[in-house]
Amino acid sequence: MNQKVLFIDRDGTLINEPPADFQVDRMDKLALEPGVIPVLLALQKAGFRLVMITNQDGLGTTSFPQADFDGPHDLMMAIFTSQGIVFDEVLICPHLPTDGCACRKPQTGIVTPWLKEHALDSAHSYVIGDRETDMALAANMGITGLRYQRASLNWPAIGEQLTRSDRHARVNRVTRETAIDVEVWLDREGDSRINTGIGFFDHMLDQIATHGGLRINIAVKGDLHIDDHHTVEDTALALGEALNKALGDKRGIGRFGFVLPMDECLARCALDISGRPHLEYKAKYSFQRVGDLSTEMVEHFFRSLSYAMACTLHLRTKGKNDHHRVESLFKAFGRTLRQAIRVEGDTLPSSKGVL
């Protein structure tokens, strides 16, 4: 699994950088940046791995003896460790700018061996540092840089930015029969835009968005001149994949989630975002179509969705009106999905340690 990693500068970011000589070479110069410990703990709980990466000009020379560096550095590391903060690696470039090395930030030489041994989630990994060289390093690594500033983008602000939920994914699926673009935001509501070419199907998908408390954009070009099969099936596959991607590592989600009455109908939906696709479905219809949607495609939609989303889904409905039967299933699924994707903590809801 790809890992979310924070590559963090030391001087001026984790600890104060002395303005006189820019060297932390005595114990009395060591001072942690405000709020760094509780924020790093929160970021670790949110699933981030930590790597320290620092330039230390002339380390090991007469201008900056190794022993002068080791004392304050070892104390800093001991403080972090005592508070439960673990750095996977501490990467130090000891060279001067004039040495022309490949490991000095913003060059990536110092981090390349680490990257070769670890799968990086580039979309959710960051370089955090107080200098332009840190931002250039982020650009060279193809990840986002966060410019630390004590007065503005400080540790509490960084923690808020990186732990705030805005789970999002986009899937583009193109086959000989359909071209589908699906975009989902699990933590935003309203302003969904859905156009599959099947009016009643659009209405049903909007029920998932509305009752699921999420935003869904779906644009479909399908072979409706033949029938609605490929359009419904491929939309379900793309939507399921997008939901699965947006959930990320699933840390902190409710995972399980509902009985929904609608007029004369009673719909039951049970959902487990388990990583194991399975559908149990029970519904009977009086007619072959509801509006411009084939009723037989309702089961096929949820089967394809559960497969692509990798979830276990149980659905059943009873009632007298086909429109209400179908709509009750989509609404019940939306309400159940709302429960299951809600972030309730910071641990993975599985005794196996993986979903």
UniProtKB/Swiss-Prot annotation:
Binding positions (Zn(2+)): 93, 95, 101, 103
Location of the protein in the cell: Cytoplasm
Pfam families, sorted: Hydrolase_like, IGPD
Active site: residue positions: 9, 11
E.C. number(s) listed in UniProt: 3.1.3.15, 4.2.1.19
Pathway it works in: Amino-acid biosynthesis; L-histidine biosynthesis; L-histidine from 5-phospho-alpha-D-ribose 1-diphosphate: step 6/9; Amino-acid biosynthesis; L-histidine biosynthesis; L-histidine from 5-phospho-alpha-D-ribose 1-diphosphate: step 8/9
Recorded family membership: In the N-terminal section; belongs to the histidinol-phosphatase family. In the C-terminal section; belongs to the imidazoleglycerol-phosphate dehydratase family.
Name of the protein in its database record: Histidine biosynthesis bifunctional protein HisB
